[in-house]
Every structure is written in C-alpha cells, then in structure tokens.
Amino acid sequence: MNSPTLTRKSVAGDWHTGWLFPIVMLFTMLTGCASLPDVDYLRRGQLQAQKPTIVTTNGTLSDGKTQSVLDRMAAKVGATDILARHVAAEEAISSAPLVAGNKVVLLDDGPITMQAMMNALRTARDHINLETYIIEADEVGRAFADLLIQKRAAGVQVNLIYDSVGALTTPPEFFDRLRAGGINLVEYNPINPLKAERKWDINQRDHRKLLIVDGRVAYTGGVNISRVYGKSSLIRGKRNQASPEDAKQSAWRDTHMQIEGPVVAEFQKLFLDTWRRQTGNDMSAKRYFPPLKPEGNALVRALGSTADQEDYSVYKTYVSALSNASNYVHLTTAYFVPDQQIVEAMKEAAQRGVDVKIIFPSFSDHEMILYAGRSFYDELLQAGVKIYERRIAMLHAKTAVVDGVWSTIGSTNLDMRSFLHNDELNAVILNVDFAEKMEALFQRDLRDSDQITLESWRQRGVGQKMKEWAVRVLEYWL
C-alpha cells in the first residue's frame, strides 16, 4: 500500500494525511476512546415511538393534520409503513423538528452545485454564512473568494468557518486576503493549539458543508470548495479500472441539495452554534432569521452532530432507516468503516427481504480506508446485501433513499470518524417526488458501477486480503 503524502489532494476528501494521521491516532489513544451508543433497541423495534410532530410557519400541526400529511405521502408510494414506523421512531431519537413547507432541489454533480451556489452568492443582500471542510486556493476557491470579497465590499456580512485540517495546504495568504477584505473567519480547531480560542481537540474536525444566503436559501451535502468539482463526473466512459492517482486528477461524483423554506432557519441555528462553540461569541441576531414563508411541500429535518453530542441523531437515524425499511434501502458512501451495529442493521434488513444496495468507490484518495471498507464485504454479501463499486469518477456522495419516500443527503460517511469524531450535517427529506429523483440518480450511478458477488470476492488475491486485515485493526481512527 502506498503511504498517503502531504499534498492538497491527499486531504481533498477527508482529513487523513501522511504525518498527521499517526500523531492524531497516538493522541487519541492516550486520551481515551469514545464509543457509539447501544442501539439494539432500535434494531429490535423496542423504541418507545412518539407521535410525529410537524412544524409549520403557523406553528405545530395537530395530531390529526400531521397524520393527514403523512397519509397523503404514503398513498403515493403504495403499501409501506416507512412513514408510520420510521417517522415515529425518528421523532423519539432526535430533538430536531420536522419542518413542513420546503422546496428542495437535487444537485447531482459538481459543476451544477458550484453554479447554483455562486448564483446564490451573487444575489446576497444581507449576509452569507459559509461552513466548509475544505476550501482550496485553486481556480474554484479563488472564484469563491473573489465573489465573497466583492459582496463584502457591497455591504453584505460574510462569515466563513473552515476546518484547520481540511485547509491544511491552503496557503495562509489565501485567508489573509479574505480577512483583509472584511470577511469574518473562524479556523475550526486549529492544528496549532496556541491558536485555539476554546478547548483544543485535534481529533475533532468540522466535516460539514453548508452555505446560507440571507437566511432564505441553504445548500448542503458532500461538496467542498475544490477544483475536483469544477468538471462533470457524469460523462460515461469505457474505462473500468482506476487508481488512487485518478482520485487526485478526475472529477468527483458528489451530491448536494438546495433548500428554501422554513427549515432554513434550523440550518442557520446549526451554523451559529458552531460559531459560538468555536469563538464564544453569540451571533444569534434577528438579522439571521428573516420571516420565512412556505416554498414547497417537502418535510425536512436538519440533523447536526458533534463529537461531544449526547443523542447521536445522525447515527441513530441511519440505524432506524435500515431497521424500519419495508422495500428497499439504497445507499452511497465515500468512506465505509462502520461499527458492528450498522453492519447488523444492514444484514437484518437484507435477511427480511429488503433490497439493500450500497455503492462504494472503486478507487479512493485514501487507500487505507478503501481496504478497511472492503474488509466488511464478505460478511455483508453472505447476508444478501448487494455491493457495487463505481468506476471512473471518484464517488464522494453520502446519500440514502428508502422505500420511495425517505431520503437523506449530507456530509456523514458511514464510518466511525463521521459518527464519533466529526461535526457533521445531514438533511432528512420526506417527499415522494424528491425520493424519485434520488432513486433515479442512484440508478444512474448503478449503471456506472460493477457488482461485487460473493463468489468473485472470495477469489481476490492474498495481498488484498492482507491489506484489509492490516487496516481493519485501525478502524476506530480512520
């Protein structure tokens, strides 16, 4: 296995870098290990479910009106109890409100996402709040920087949170220019502890991707500010093999979304909470929360997780979705190093007849994580889970669509780092039309993927098996 090198591309998808990884691993081992909560009760259906609560611009709907909304959605997809069971379970495991009246737009590739976000920035009149794991000093990052500085000069308040590790090789001059342009900057958990204004924890990273313009439109998903999203990943080709080097050069296949409506305020709260936790300054002024009217018919829940969380809502939501699915669960993830409870939930769903399909990348910018994920293939395939690896473009999307009505898009990978160590952000969407678009995108990715069968998988070479074994023991820190 080639050792990761300290280049911009080696941190493009996540935070793992050549020299930083062993330092962080040692630091973590010396300071103790967090663990995920026992969620066996979710998998066994033993959760004390609560009646769903739907929030609107006019307040909380009555139980009767809430049930009517859910019944109408269920009727569109036929016989499924994903709404009756999963929504009730999710209500019990998350404190985030389920908000009605939202317009959601699926952004299925890098260029369309960049164009949509740049267009939104140009319309900004009051404020721009941007939170990103990576912001590069390449042509894409410079274009964003130019526009942010231009809007600040026009009187727009601009606040930017970037992760210290994610921006490890972005030159300091890039941020100096933004600061000189009047932009408020927060470097999340600086690598240098002397720069930290609050509690220093190098192992905790801000992996969220969030843009909010004027408190009225939000963008979230898996897309960072990087040149790998500057060209389309949807051009199909004949080449079946790729390498880690391709991950540094090719376009990345990712998924983002645009949200308008009342739930934007919930995303705004998450941004402001991160700002407060990092700086100690509370920016929850009225300017960030304009009156919002209904823009569509999607129910959306904004789920934010942190390393010091108590409810593990994103993690529990994935387990709940798998445990309550009736027909299918279709997942994509860039990095796969799950705990055993997620694995068991996948296996149990497949064994009760649910069509569980997962698309992974066939090559990665982090070879260690690729092999760690593959070490779970045999166990999943034996249980009936269908596994695919996407060719050509580096798959970085973190999505799920369940039973044609429940979807999620966000920054959370199905790995221990996302569930335990990072600040992550996911949107959960209850909307049949949006789920149809999500499923169509999944099927398009499926056409550009190779299925991994149990028979073919067991014929892989000894060298690959050794790599899987070697990295599996490090799964907690990957």
Could you tell me what each predicted segment is?
Residues 11-12, 19, 211-212:
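Sequence-pattern detector for short linear motifs
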Residues 29-32:
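C-terminal motif of bacterial Sec signal peptides marking the signal peptidase cleavage site
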Residues 34-478:
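Charged, low-complexity intrinsically disordered terminal segments
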Residues 17-24:
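Sec-dependent signal peptide recognition
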Residues 1-15:
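N-terminal secretory signal peptides that target proteins for export/translocation
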